[in-house]
Amino acid sequence: MEHQSLSNIGITPLSNALGAEIDGVDLSQPLEKAQFEDIQKALCTYGAIGFRNQKLSHQNQIDFALRFGTLEVHPIVKGMEEYPEIIRMHKPAGTPASFGVGWHSDNSFFDKPSLGSIVYAETVPPVGGDTLFANQQLAYDMLSNGIKEMLEGLIAIHSAKDAYTSPSALEKYDSDGPISYNRSDIIEDFIEHPVVIRHPVTGKKALYVNAMFTHHFKDWTVEESKPLLEFLFAHTTREELQCRFKWEKGSLLMWDNRVVQHAALNDYVEYDRTLYRVTVNGTKLI
């Protein structure tokens, strides 16, 4: 996994599987063409890229995200009043539940799932709260030829219903809490995506199922789907597919939702944390 830089930015891989930290760039300032091209290529190469010691306004974060495409206003999770594209993910000290716990790809229940998520850290705990990532291209490559052949052409059904109707989720609807949900018909939708997709830029194949939002296979019953899905959920999050990002104040992290799963660790109950997420709209997966 190697990327040839066109500009003066530095790239340090986080693991053999995926992930890199990028230095030599101030995201509060307009990016030069060569800098942005390097960042785009690094995202495609490493799947998740982090930037340290950034001092960003909300508008800075939006401006950076807009370089990658149009921005999402989430149909369920309420955005900030002044910046509806930004979700403020605030977890006060003493709060047991956390947002984004469990392996998933953001918004795989959309007909056109998110291209990427961009998260900026304002307040972080002194320890804990790391985010894990898993490379779904490598997960596909590690499968036997026999199961690859079986998965070709298989369609998975994705749904937000289980995740957004759990007891902890129901408390967030129309609430004044740190994270609040809107009521949306999208929760009732069942969306089809191929189990094996191709990255629209690199053309590499990747697995596209996740334990949070993948419900069953098309033309299979839930019971029939369960054994294969359980295998895939375990396989796609194996340790050798992972990297780990430790948050610091001023960190910004972007990941490619099409070929990377992530999971937030909820191991900092006694501390505050505030992150801001912007999500770039994607296209239909094939």
Q: What does each of the following model-derived ranges do?
A:
Residues 2-252, 258-286:
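Non-heme Fe(II) oxygenase catalytic core, chiefly the N-lobe of the double-stranded beta-helix
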